[in-house]
């Protein structure tokens, strides 16, 4: 929703994401915009495509992303053993784009989201060339991308960055810590969450760093894409409805009760789409 909203104001936005298997058809329809001979263990390409009215950049690296399981976990439910390389590659590619790797377009600002993109400012910092500022966005500070310090070399990170003011985190590497320490600005999903992150109870070990940087920390309340979450046009619903035509809402409730074996009731019915975790 954020890229679409920015684009609507005239900002030229490009969204970089890994070319996961579910995006294979979309990638096949695109144009190669940039290539890497060796991106953390194999060749890779950045493919330019358009989707939902947005300019997308797909990082096509089959050795890192073309596999069974889900985005973060293997079929056994455990983290992929090379998740550090998989998401270092995403950060490295973003940094190269920021250094004019595409040739015909260079971002004015890079917005990196969560630990998976946390190394973007680290790669820009160690390169040394003029680069766009980085805004680091925290969606959930509990996920920090922590890996053994021995991974510095495989991750193509200079040892000079391994300091308390850089990527070092209790003797290990933290991708999220790197993003928070080295970015120019930090945002998160609400003003209240931004305030919570400054406390030991909710800062998950990074509250001290965030207190040091609180003048650069902004809480921006999460919104939704009103085109996607519109019950009047949502094709995934049993029946559509609107604020003035509510009949379809009752049909959706009946379907939900039937699907989950709920006892029919006239009382309120609340539904939550969420991870099952103590945080929620």
Spans of model-derived segments:
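Catalytic cores of nucleotide-sugar-dependent glycosyltransferases that transfer UDP/GDP/TDP-activated
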Residues: 1-280
């Amino acid at each position: 929703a954020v890229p679409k909203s920015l684009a609507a104001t005239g900002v030229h936005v490009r969204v970089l994401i890994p070319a996961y298997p579910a995006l294979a058809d979309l990638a096949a329809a695109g144009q190669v915009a940039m290539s890497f001979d060796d991106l953390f263990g194999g060749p890779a390409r950045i493919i330019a495509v358009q989707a939902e009215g947005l300019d997308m950049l797909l990082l096509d690296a089959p050795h890192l992303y073309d596999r069974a399981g889900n985005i973060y976990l293997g079929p056994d439910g455990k983290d992929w053993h090379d998740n550090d390389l998989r998401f270092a590659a995403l950060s490295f590619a973003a940094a190269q784009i920021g250094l004019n790797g595409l040739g015909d377009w260079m971002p004015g600002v890079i917005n990196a989201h969560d630990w998976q993109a946390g190394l973007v400012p680290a790669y820009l910092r160690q390169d040394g060339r003029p680069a766009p500022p980085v805004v680091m966005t925290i969606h959930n500070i509990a996920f920090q991308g922590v890996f053994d310090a021995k991974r510095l070399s495989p991750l193509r990170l200079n040892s000079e960055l391994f300091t308390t003011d850089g990527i070092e985190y209790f003797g290990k590497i933290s991708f999220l810590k790197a993003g928070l320490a080295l970015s120019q600005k930090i945002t998160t999903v609400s003003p209240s969450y931004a305030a919570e992150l400054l406390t030991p109870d909710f800062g998950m070990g990074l509250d001290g760093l965030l207190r040091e940087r609180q003048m650069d920390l902004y809480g921006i309340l999460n919104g939704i894409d009103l085109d996607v979450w519109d019950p009047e046009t949502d094709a995934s619903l049993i029946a559509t409805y609107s604020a003035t035509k509510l009949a379809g809402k009752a049909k959706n409730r009946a379907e939900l009760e039937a699907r989950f074996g709920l006892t029919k009731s006239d009382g309120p019915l609340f539904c939550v789409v969420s991870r099952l975790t103590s945080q929620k």
